[in-house]
């Protein structure tokens, strides 16, 4: 007799894996859709031109398409091009591995800067003062200081005349066309939906693919009726707003927010490699190799610091919320419990997961802030090494009250053979009972990345994505439960929506998120394709000036 559940799972997995293959981007259907796309005409950009803020950091550094077009513009003016090339050389030096190559690059930069500004000088964007410093530099420290000054001057130069000329150029016109294209309405027709990957309190998470680019994402579908019945609207909106503010390679990105008839949808980074909890307990011997522990911990620390810099406390750090991508890099996910520090005011509301909550969260009416995340980080590093949490053994049955008392009173023990001295030390420091004694919180400049546990990690290269992960997930494996194991939600009855609800849904559905959307457009080749003046198109003449999308989405 055929097992229909197993058959359904096989079909769902096969379709999902097929969609994930890079070759799928070459499908005839995808190419047909892309031929039917065109950028909006310039005449439709007049209002946007008036509204858009001319902020250099946003336009030319943060937004990928703006950055790309600004770079292309600089290449058309010799003086501007030299400044841009110099900054690229500085970045390459900063990201180079320590050794003779990096030393040689530094000396080359100093020599480049040492020429005094004069007619015909190849570095007119640098001052005489910087040239003099470079000429006088004899030690490595002096050379680094001189190049740092030169970098600042080159950046300041680009923000003046080059930027002014850029925003009156055809390159900026093209940017406006892309911004208008970015602002098109988004609905469920924009995506192809694949298998369910999991579920949460208000709905399910499924894999989706953008029809026009082939890009795969995870879509968190929040049931509107369930949200209203459980009073979850505020939490959902807070998670969305926090995700919109965060742009970090170590935190899942929000790419789209839209509504369907029944759901509010958050479309985010698809992490195909599973979560760290799965890898700790379900792949080989419990626990992870130390090389993986160090690598993941370094990326987690970077993500945590990015949140803290934005005034956000994560409050739900645990291996289950750390997801791996196709290449083996990890990102923090599920920001549903994250909270913004309003004016630096501490928080008192209890939130988190048992076994990872810091003592100050567990104590009644005690305020807390960023240090709680470092405590949970200590719990997570311990778990990655030992295959158990610090205050509860693997599969041990412990009441919430007992676990609370252990967290408040017990000193952490290191009985697992895999603990190195560095791992023990960083766990002890993260698991300090008092937040003011905790690593990352002892003083303003207390940076966990400086701990000797991370001595093998070059953090600038890590942040630039230049370090190869120690483990790469198997691309032929679906790291998710069988669809039969994912519970269905019961129907929510007796919930009606009023005008206030409908307005909330409308406000929630803001469409594409600029940075993530622009990254998708460049990554999938659509940027080059739509910018090509010679490309064949399936649009009728004149359609592009009206909508920018000739094919119904």
UniProtKB/Swiss-Prot annotation:
Keyword annotations of the record: ATP-binding, Kinase, Lipoprotein, Membrane, Methylation, Nucleotide-binding, Phosphoprotein, Prenylation, Sensory transduction, Serine/threonine-protein kinase, Transferase, Vision
Compartmental location: Membrane
Miscellaneous remark of the record: Although the protein is present in a diversity of vertebrates ranging from bony fish to mammals, the mouse and rat orthologous proteins do not exist.
Name under which the protein is recorded: Rhodopsin kinase GRK7
Post-translational modification: Autophosphorylated in vitro at Ser-490. Phosphorylation at Ser-36 is regulated by light and activated by cAMP.
Covalent lipidation (S-geranylgeranyl cysteine), chain numbering: 550
PROSITE patterns: AGC_KINASE_CTER, PROTEIN_KINASE_ATP, PROTEIN_KINASE_DOM, PROTEIN_KINASE_ST, RGS
Biological source species: Homo sapiens (Human)
Domain named AGC-kinase C-terminal: residues: 455-520
Membrane topology annotation: Lipid-anchor
Chief place where the protein resides: membrane
């Amino acid at each position: 007799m055929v097992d229909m559940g197993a058959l359904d799972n096989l079909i769902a997995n096969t379709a999902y894996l097929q969609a994930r293959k890079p070759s799928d981007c070459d499908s005839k259907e995808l190419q047909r859709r892309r031929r039917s796309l065109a950028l909006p005409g310039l005449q439709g950009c007049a209002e946007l031109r008036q509204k858009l803020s001319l902020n250099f950091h946003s336009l030319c550094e943060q937004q990928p398409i703006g950055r790309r077009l600004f770079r292309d513009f600089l290449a058309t003016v010799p003086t501007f091009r030299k400044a841009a090339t110099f900054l690229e050389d500085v970045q390459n030096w900063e990201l180079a591995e320590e050794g003779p190559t990096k030393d040689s690059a530094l000396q080359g930069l100093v020599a480049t800067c040492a020429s005094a500004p004069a007619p015909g000088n190849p570095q007119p964007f640098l001052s005489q003062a910087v040239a003099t410093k470079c000429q006088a530099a004899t030690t490595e420290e002096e050379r680094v200081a001189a190049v740092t000054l030169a970098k600042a001057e080159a950046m300041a130069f680009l923000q003046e005349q080059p930027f002014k000329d850029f925003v009156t150029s055809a390159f900026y016109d093209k940017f406006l066309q892309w911004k208008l294209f970015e602002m098109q309405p988004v609905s469920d027709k924009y995506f192809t939906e694949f298998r369910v990957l999991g579920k949460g309190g208000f709905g399910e998470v499924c894999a989706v693919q953008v029809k026009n680019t082939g890009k795969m994402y995870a879509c968190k579908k929040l049931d509107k009726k369930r949200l209203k019945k459980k009073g979850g609207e505020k939490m959902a909106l807070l998670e969305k707003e926090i995700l919109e503010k965060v742009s970090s390679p170590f935190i899942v990105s929000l790419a789209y927010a839209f509504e369907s008839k029944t759901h509010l949808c958050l479309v985010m980074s698809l992490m195909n490699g599973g979560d760290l909890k799965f890898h700790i307990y379900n792949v080989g011997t419990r626990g992870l190799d130390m090389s993986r522990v160090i690598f993941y911990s370094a990326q987690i620390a970077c993500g945590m610091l990015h949140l803290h810099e934005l005034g956000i406390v994560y409050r739900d750090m645990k291996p289950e919320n750390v997801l791996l991508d196709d290449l083996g890099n990890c990102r923090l996910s599920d920001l549903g419990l994250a909270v913004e520090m309003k004016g630096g005011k501490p928080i008192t509301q209890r939130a988190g997961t048992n076994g990872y909550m810091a003592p100050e969260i567990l104590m009644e009416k005690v305020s807390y802030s960023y240090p709680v995340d470092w405590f949970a980080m200590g719990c997570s590093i311990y778990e990655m090494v030992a295959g158990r949490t610090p205050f509860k053994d693997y599969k041990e049955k412990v009441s919430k009250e007992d676990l609370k008392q252990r967290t408040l009173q017990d000193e952490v023990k290191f009985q697992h053979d895999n603990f190195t001295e560095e791992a023990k030390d960083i766990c002890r420091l993260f698991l300090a009972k008092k937040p003011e004694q905790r690593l990352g919180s002892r003083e303003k400049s207390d940076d966990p990345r400086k701990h000797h546990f991370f001595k093998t990690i070059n953090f600038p290269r890590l942040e630039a994505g230049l370090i190869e992960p120690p483990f790469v997930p198997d691309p032929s494996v679906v790291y998710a439960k069988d669809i039969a194991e994912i519970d269905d939600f019961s129907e929510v009855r007796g919930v009606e929506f009023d005008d206030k609800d409908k307005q909330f849904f409308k406000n929630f559905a803001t469409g594409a998120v600029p940075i993530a959307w622009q990254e998708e457009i460049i990554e999938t080749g659509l940027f080059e394709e739509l910018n090509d003046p010679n490309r064949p198109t399936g649009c009728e003449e004149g359609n592009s000036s009206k909508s920018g999308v000739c094919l119904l989405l």
